[in-house]
Regions:
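Short, ordered beta-strand-loop transition motifs
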Residues: 4-13, 51-60, 141-145
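Intrinsically disordered, low-complexity sequence elements enriched in Ser/Thr/Gly/Pro
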Residues: 6, 46, 149-151
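A generic "functional-site adjacency" signal
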Residues: 10, 43, 58, 125-126
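Short, acidic/charged, Gly/Pro-enriched secondary-structure junctions
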Residues: 19-54, 82-98, 130, 134
Length: 170
């Protein structure tokens, strides 16, 4: 079985359980990439294996993080800019090493964004005071090697949850 779990503006991980003597089990190694389809509406996403355990029942338990976690290893130099579009583009242009990710946003804001000390690209996006998420609000979507920062992810279908009508119990 394979389960992908994505938390809003948080973790994005894969858990795979398969027989230790399964068809491609020998190819599962830490650092390797698994391409998995997180949902019916999304394209397959790459996940890098970070942990493999073998419980007593002879099955491998593989844990992997979305490829976007590579952004933890890309350092961004200090800079300051106004606007969300300028902020996400500035992160890419001030990266200290090659950054294979593209960035995109639909957030229209003229707020100031500042990286005052060198920090990881992913922390600059969300995970520290003054991050893109902290400064502009919004929701991240990790789509392969594209970082999308939405004003609001998904759609509002104008459905109200009312106790006793469409909610019967807690």
């Amino acid at each position: 079985s394979c389960t992908v779990t994505e938390k809003r503006n948080g973790s994005y991980e894969l858990k795979l359980i398969c027989p230790a003597d399964g068809i491609h089990a020998e190819m599962l190694e830490e650092g390797h990439v698994i391409l998995a389809k997180p949902s019916d509406t999304m394209q397959s996403q790459p996940f890098r294996i970070y942990k493999i355990t073998t419980p007593i029942d002879g099955k491998l338990e593989v844990q992997a993080r979305h490829i976007s976690y590579q952004l933890n290893f890309i350092t961004v130099s200090p800079f300051s800019v106004s606007g969300c579009a300028g902020a996400v583009q500035g992160l890419k242009s001030h990266a200290a090493s090659d950054c294979p990710f593209s960035v995109w946003t639909d957030v229209a804001s003229s707020a100031m964004f500042t990286v005052s000390v060198p920090a990881s690209f992913r922390n600059c996006l969300g995970g520290m005071d003054g991050s893109v998420l902290d400064t502009f609000g919004g929701e991240f979507e990790w789509d392969r090697y594209t970082v999308k920062f939405h004003r609001a992810r998904g759609a509002d279908h104008n459905v109200h949850i009312v106790y006793g009508k469409n909610l019967t119990d807690f």
